[in-house]
Amino acid sequence: MDRIVEIEKYSLDETYETSLRPSNFDGYIGQESIKKNLNIFITAAKKRNECLDHILFSGPAGLGKTTLANIISYEMDANIKTTAAPMIEKSGDLAAILTNLSEGDILFIDEIHRLSPAIEEVLYPAMEDYRLDIIIGSGPAAQTIKIDLPKFTLIGATTRAGMLSNPLRDRFGMQFRLEFYKDSELALILQKAALKLNKTCEEKAALEIAKRSRSTPRIALRLLKRVRDFADVNDEEIITEKRANEALNSLGVNELGFDAMDLRYLELLTAAKQKPIGLASIAAALSEDENTIEDVIEPYLLANGYIERTAKGRIASTKSYSALKLNYEKTLFEE
């Protein structure tokens, strides 16, 4: 069963989410420092009539890395071609993408940390020298053919910057980490998005949805879509706090933004009574993939102090006990 607070992209939601994305920096809310610096770099590159240097965006899923890539394309008046690292299985796949680029194009690679070392080797000269080295044959008879590429900007996005090899990371001239959003920022995003959906969202309703969105715009917009359904069924043009609460409670998203999976995760850790639990054990207990736990469930819990990650495993913090209305002292020391 799909989680309403799932952060990964749903293919059916892509058209919906794209229609709500801002097209320029003026409409982009949050990440102020990143916006300010990008504006400067874009303006400078346009004055010099040059491509932007390569850019790496990192941070938890759903914070706007893809949106920023598209805004950069708009601000640079450049074409953008989008792909994801898992789709680039062979060096020939990457070569086909690179040779189809035009001067000044932007290539956006999502989940760039999942590129294989062999693919990275092809990417290095393309990023540094705008050159593609193709090896024909094998052994002593192997030959390298060098193909010049048009100047382009590579924008990479990753939820796991630590998994990037140092040579690849060092080839990005600009590196930015996106941070979780404040509730007030999410509320503004929601009110703007509601207008695009032909609804008016009251400020208190927007804040209520924001509070349950795990500080993540993608989740906030998905919840807004579901709350809108409740409003439509009741023939309401205005999304009220009461209707938002009703919808979110019905969806099983509590006041902290936790759903059933989050609660199962925290209950597992608190039941361990401060004994660390390894990732593999958690994945087995929850019947979830380890990557899903690390990329989807844990980032928000870690950032907000609900769990601690140690060398031996995960431990629930006192904040988790409070969230589950458990007595920390009793749970910690009872036999």
Swiss-Prot record:
Domain of life per record: Bacteria
Record has Zinc as a keyword: no
SMART domains (UniProt xref): AAA
InterPro entries: AAA+_ATPase, AAA_lid_4, DNA_helicase_Holl-junc_RuvB, P-loop_NTPase, RuvB-like_N, RuvB_C, WH-like_DNA-bd_sf, WH_DNA-bd_sf
Region Large ATPase domain (RuvB-L), annotated ranges: 1-181
Keywords from the named record: ATP-binding, Cytoplasm, DNA damage, DNA recombination, DNA repair, DNA-binding, Hydrolase, Nucleotide-binding
Region Head domain (RuvB-H): start-end pairs: 255-335
Protein name: Holliday junction branch migration complex subunit RuvB
